[in-house]
Amino acid sequence: MAHPGRRGYDNREIVLKYIHYKLSQRGYDWAAGEDRPPVPPAPAPAAAPAAVAAAGASSHHRPEPPGSAAASEVPPAEGLRPAPPGVHLALRQAGDEFSRRYQRDFAQMSGQLHLTPFTAHGRFVAVVEELFRDGVNWGRIVAFFEFGGVMCVESVNREMSPLVDNIATWMTEYLNRHLHNWIQDNGGWDAFVELYGNSMRPLFDFSWISLKTILSLVLVGACITLGAYLGHK
């Protein structure tokens, strides 16, 4: 249930701290950027974004060169609050569980991304729009964060660290424009913590998905329905 009059937590802060955590797991030191102003949630679109059939078909989404994280210059939005530690902890634990279940797939997927400063945005858009094409649930949101983390780690591995700021911006913008209302309507991040952040047992109720499978199908131009792979929460 949404909380009237409450805009929720600052999604950008949640993204930045998650990315910082994922990079620190690999021994990379990246500033979480708490001093960066938040990106205000945008009005919900009239219709869900159309799925991108292939990364090569993502010409509708112009790639952004490194350093073009325009959203980081948006002034702070009133009503956004920093998320409490429990939100960050629950999300990290959920992402780690996802990663453990698909450790081999993640290793293979990193080699398939073929990231460059001018392909990264197309890869991100194709996979994320495909991920949520069949709807939203908490499991898919966790997958979204973990995929973003993989992209950031791969960017640093390939000595393209400036891409990390861009990926953080793309994740924040997608959360604000396409996922914020769903999150608020389902109790906000506090509900996520209540449902999945204490015993961690309910995490096994997620119908997880191999992100490698999504990525592979997107890259070869297959248009898939994720309902066959990822169930509802």
Swiss-Prot record:
Pfam families: Bcl-2, BH4. It is a single-pass membrane protein. A motif (BH3) lies at residues 87-101. It is found in: Mitochondrion outer membrane; Nucleus membrane; Endoplasmic reticulum membrane; Cytoplasm. In adult chicken expressed, in thymus, spleen, kidney, heart, ovary and brain, with the highest levels in the thymus. In the embryo, highly levels expressed in all tissues with high levels in the bursa of Fabricius. The chain crosses the membrane at residues 208-228. The keyword Transcription does not apply. The BH4 motif is required for anti-apoptotic activity and for interaction with RAF-1. GO terms for biological process: actin filament organization; axon regeneration; axonogenesis; B cell apoptotic process; B cell homeostasis; B cell lineage commitment; B cell proliferation; B cell receptor signaling pathway. Residues 32-86 are annotated as: Disordered. Suppresses apoptosis in a variety of cell systems including factor-dependent lymphohematopoietic and neural cells. Regulates cell death by controlling the mitochondrial membrane permeability. Appears to function in a feedback loop system with caspases. Inhibits caspase activity either by preventing the release of cytochrome c from the mitochondria and/or by binding to the apoptosis-activating factor (APAF-1). A motif (BH4) lies at residues 10-30. PANTHER family: APOPTOSIS REGULATOR BCL-2, BCL-2 RELATED. GO terms for molecular function: BH3 domain binding; channel activity; channel inhibitor activity; DNA-binding transcription factor binding; identical protein binding; molecular adaptor activity; protease binding; protein heterodimerization activity. The gene is BCL2. A motif (BH2) lies at residues 181-196. This is Apoptosis regulator Bcl-2. It comes from the Eukaryota. Belongs to the Bcl-2 family. Keywords: Apoptosis, Cytoplasm, Endoplasmic reticulum, Membrane, Mitochondrion, Mitochondrion outer membrane, Nucleus, Transmembrane, Transmembrane helix. Disulfide bonds: none annotated. Its main location: mitochondrion. One of its GO terms (cellular component) is BAD-BCL-2 complex. Forms homodimers, and heterodimers with BAX, BAD, BAK and Bcl-X(L). Heterodimerization with BAX requires intact BH1 and BH2 motifs, and is necessary for anti-apoptotic activity. Also interacts with APAF1 and RAF-1. The keyword RNA-binding does not apply. A motif (BH1) lies at residues 130-149. NCBIfam families: bcl-2.
